[in-house]
Amino acid sequence: MLGLGTLARKIFGTPNDRKVKSVRSLVARINDLEPEFQALSDEGIKQKTAEFQRRVQEGGESLDDLLPEAFANCREGARRALGLRAFDVQLMGGIFLHQGNIAEMKTGEGKTLVATFPAYLNALAGKGVHVVTVNDYLAKRDAEWMGKVYAQLGLATGVVYPFQSDEEKKAAYAADITYATNNELGFDYLRDNMKASKEEMRQRGHFFAIVDEVDSILIDEARTPLIISGPSQDRSDLYTKVDKLIPELVEEHYKLDEKTRNVTFTEEGNEFLEKRLLETGLLPEGQSLYDPESTTIVHHVNQGLRAHKLFNRDQQYIVRDDEIMLIDEFTGRMMRGRRLSDGLHQAIEAKEGVSIQPENVTLASVTFQNYFRLYEKLGGMTGTAATEAEEFMEIYGLGVVEVPTNRPVARADEHDAVYRTAREKHDGIVASIKDAHERGQPILVGTTSIDKSEALSDLLKSAGIPHNVLNARQHEQEAQIVADAGKLGAVTIATNMAGRGTDIQLGGNVEMKVMQALAADPAAHPDEVRARIEAEHAEEKERVKEAGGLFVLGTERHESRRIDNQLRGRSGRQGDPGRSAFFLSLEDDLMRIFGSDRLDKVLSTLGMKEGEAIVHPWVNKSLEKAQAKVEARNFDIRKQLLKFDDVMNDQRKAIFSQRLEIMETEDLSEIAQDMRYQVIDDLIDQHMPPRSYADQWDIEGMHRAVQDKLGLDAPLAKWAQEEGVDQDVVRERLCEASDRQMTEKAEAFGPETMRSIEKQILLQTIDAKWREHLLTLEHLRSVVGFRGYAQRDPLSEYKTEAFALFESMLNSLRQDVTQKLAQVRPLSEEEQQAMMRQFLDQQRAAAAAEAPVAPAPQPAAAAPQPTPELVGAEAGEPDPAAWGNVARNDPCPCGSGLKYKHCHGRLD
């Protein structure tokens, strides 16, 4: 008998069915327009793009109204540029992306081509579209490949990757459609908000982003903040000394919680540690671990414990070229340039005996959650999103739509096989691989870590089974290994295949084979080579199909069902046959941590023999329940982290917005004046409290403060003795005196130079104060959780204190800006010449030693500038004739620190 829910779905359809049905009329309209666009010339297609741009940008037509025509034009452009005609389901995927949804499309359904449709349509608005990929290789590959489509349509394509110059990045972001990784987009956003002028900024706004592998970026990476950091003090010696103590610990000294990935010292551990720290001199005599002075050493010891007990070589990281390289637990890739914060990376470096890099201080940070919420519209693609649909909707406002496959999935998904021990499981895996290999069926074996992939590789070597291994160590050969994975009888062991970005094609990859053949014989005719290889490939593909297609064998369940589904999804692409199965044991991490005791009792009751496996739907359901619990817990953690980060995000947006306003404003004298007046108000409130008499005022303290903050020697004692002088009179006189002082400075510097100085000082001070504030918030966040023990809500406490700290930072900012502007003064000609001589001496000494040239000393009035290039100038009077052509916005070669146009290049 059918349940009520099942019956309702059969009658009314699922919500997903209704969404798919709702766009069928649009797809039909696009199909109806196809002959019209096929009749256009190549130039006619480009002219259509120009027409669409006018209709949107000048005529005010909506993108939704333009969608059928734009998609029809894009489909024809792709057909001519790539020889690919988009299927109806690909058009559906494109429509859902344009509508701001996540399109769940199975592997091999052509997601890369799907992205071109909404990217083209939204690029017509002229605000730029970002297509986001998970790594630089895919960004470059997709930009080059799909760039042919956009070029056919008359649009420009850009690609952003690390180590480009500012000009290259600006050009890439100025293109109609820009391909980039999530990391580089986030870092460029932070870098832009550290620039000194708007002209230097690279990004031009956040209009529409299409995120490939959206679940990997917006969920798996959501807890990882992007941090731009600078070096702080070097404490590598302390890490090394602490690391020597950790191996002395025994199990009674610490408590390890694998579920939450946390480790803490027990009371016995603290006592042992205190004793050893005193013996080694790391803790001064008479001081205990619980004293406030011991905070630093306790922090180092805790990080050392985490490095040893939570981070394992070849699982969470590998050692390469005297460096610790982190490994992405979801994709198995190395994360170059990524470091753990708070001294944990240094603790791992000490553990492995590699060079310890200095700790860093945060200069700017943002999480992916908050970065991608900057976009006016967001869309995403993935093969697996349904299990996280609630999180996508709650945090990002993104609906998930499962797009039908072009052909029905023919893959057979088998129930999990569960063994008692890991040894029995491995025997079963090797036997299964051997059987499939002998039948010619290609096999992809998924493992969860490098060490497990290499252990399985050793077992296959012993069994005499040829195979390839794909993990972070072999990432350079990734494309070749994946291309070969679908060949007859191929055996490929891979760490998590999520986000690999390359389809495993039955019979191997034709394009890769053609490239290799042409590289081996450059004289061969490309068309003949392709025809021969395509014929061979078709024959091999049929043999692979007869053998059962690609067999995906998972050796362990991941905490996330989504990662397991991604592994399964590598098989059965475009209606190909395939098979998937997971071989598990009660010793696997997920089974061990999340309650294998009950299952162990069941297996014992059944009286299973050595080497036998239990295969039953009940086992699958139990595992999926355990995975769902882990996913729910991780979702709660991400939600809670987002609530905390939202507090900082509001402050970040306020600071970045203020910074942008300062960069865009030519004359900041009013802002500087408002700050000055506020500082005067604060000083009066502090030293001359309201409703107090003159004889109660702190005249001496006020005089010192006015000299320090305003640079004024005001006769406050004399004013206080005058009849009728109150706080308002003092305020008015100080404001007038400070205004006169700033007017005189502007005359001495010249108005244009003074405005430039005000801007530089404001931006430099904001950046410095924001850096300090980030550090303070980090410390607050690390301790505010303890307020829960006092029955106080940590989040409410964090919000209250973070707001108070923000106000305090703004107050400090006003004081520092006012003080710096009060102290700034023009350099005399003698001082400029002295600085010039000093710089030339340094340059000659550096040239003689073949060492880098030290930067020129900077006057107090100027921001640090790049080292000026001097051509043939001698010590003494600067000789402009010897400087060659100097750009007007470059630093003046005389060493004044001013721009050339404001100094020796002035047109007066």
Curated annotation (Swiss-Prot):
NCBIfam families: PRK12904.1 (NF009538), secA (TIGR00963). One of its GO terms (biological process) is protein targeting. It catalyses: ATP + H2O + cellular proteinSide 1 = ADP + phosphate + cellular proteinSide 2. The lineage of its organism: Bacteria, Pseudomonadati, Pseudomonadota, Alphaproteobacteria, Rhodobacterales. Disulfide bonds: none annotated. It is an enzyme of class 7 (translocase). Part of the Sec protein translocase complex. Interacts with the SecYEG preprotein conducting channel. Has a central role in coupling the hydrolysis of ATP to the transfer of proteins into and across the cell membrane, serving both as a receptor for the preprotein-SecB complex and as an ATP-driven molecular motor driving the stepwise translocation of polypeptide chains across the membrane. Its EC number is 7.4.2.8. HAMAP family: SecA. It is a peripheral membrane protein. Keywords: ATP-binding, Cell inner membrane, Cell membrane, Cytoplasm, Membrane, Metal-binding, Nucleotide-binding, Protein transport, Translocase, Translocation, Transport, Zinc. It is found in: Cell inner membrane; Cytoplasm. The keyword Nucleus does not apply. The gene is secA. Belongs to the SecA family. This is Protein translocase subunit SecA. The keyword Transferase does not apply. PROSITE patterns: SECA (PS01312), SECA_MOTOR_DEAD (PS51196). Zn(2+) binds at C892, C894, C903, H904. May bind 1 zinc ion per subunit. It comes from the Bacteria. Its cofactor is Zn(2+). GO terms for molecular function: ATP binding; metal ion binding; protein-exporting ATPase activity. Residues 846-864 have a biased composition (Low complexity). Residues 846-884 are annotated as: Disordered.
